[in-house]
């Protein structure tokens, strides 16, 4: 790739990012409302045609936000798993990571809980479902691996525990979005974790 081609690629990438950031901002500023491409273009000071030069459809813009979430969250989860070998601590850090990511990205949170996808293609809801399925699988894998190392292996409700942890995360995100982003998903988290920790003692 020549220097000129590299520069063009960087400019294209920065414009992609600017569009996605603008969409996330619009979702944050107008909770519960459907964001149109005309509205998005106006916020960026460009034409709708300019948007479509970078994204073939609004659905692809939403997919871009979901992909950003996947890359960010699961990249950090890999780091947690690599650096911490304690199963309970891993679960705590992953849950806190998800809640913190949500708090920092209100607009994206509305995509992940599905409220921003009303009237959009079913493919997007499937992508979001895959995101949370993957998160639950991560919890399940951590707990299963820990169970296999315990003296009295077996008998622990690994699947149910993983699903409970996921449900707590999803519930906090739902509350955050439903409150119009006023109730932080991290509100009261330290106290709530102490309660969750009592459930996970069987994996300690």
Label each PLM-derived region with a short phrase.
Residues 1-43, 60:
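Basic, helix-initiating cap at the start of DNA-binding domains
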Residues 27, 62-69:
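Alpha-helical DNA-contacting segments of helix-turn-helix folds
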Residues 27, 32-33, 53, 82, ...:
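Helix-turn-helix/winged-helix DNA-binding modules
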Residues 45-55, 61:
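Short hydrophobic/aromatic patch on the recognition helix
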Residues 64, 78-104, 158-165:
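Hydrophobic alpha-helical connector segments
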Residues 71-74, 122-148, 159-163, 187-197:
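Amphipathic alpha-helical packing segments from all-alpha helical-bundle domains
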Residues 100-104, 108, 141, 162-183, ...:
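Amphipathic C-terminal alpha-helical segment
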Residues 103-126, 174:
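Amphipathic alpha-helical segments used for helix-helix packing
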């Amino acid at each position: 790739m020549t220097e000129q081609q590299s520069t063009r690629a960087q400019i294209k990438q920065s414009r992609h990012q600017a569009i996605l950031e603008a969409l996330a901002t619009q979702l944050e500023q107008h909770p519960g409302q459907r964001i149109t491409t005309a509205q998005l273009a106006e916020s960026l000071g460009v034409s709708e045609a300019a948007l479509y030069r970078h994204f073939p459809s609004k659905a692809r813009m939403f997919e871009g936000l979901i992909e950003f979430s996947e890359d960010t969250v699961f990249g950090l989860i890999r780091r947690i798993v690599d650096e911490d070998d304690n199963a309970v601590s891993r679960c705590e850090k992953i849950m806190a990571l998800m809640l913190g990511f949500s708090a920092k990205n209100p607009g994206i949170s509305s995509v992940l809980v599905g409220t921003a996808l009303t009237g959009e293609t079913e493919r997007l809801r499937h992508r979001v479902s895959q995101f949370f399925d993957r998160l639950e699988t991560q919890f399940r894998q951590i707990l299963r691996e820990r169970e296999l190392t315990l003296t009295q292996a077996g008998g622990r409700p690994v699947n149910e525990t993983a699903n409970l942890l996921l449900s707590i995360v999803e519930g906090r995100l739902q509350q955050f979005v439903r409150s119009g982003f006023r109730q932080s998903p991290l509100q009261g988290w330290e106290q709530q974790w102490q309660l969750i920790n009592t459930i996970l003692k069987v994996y300690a």
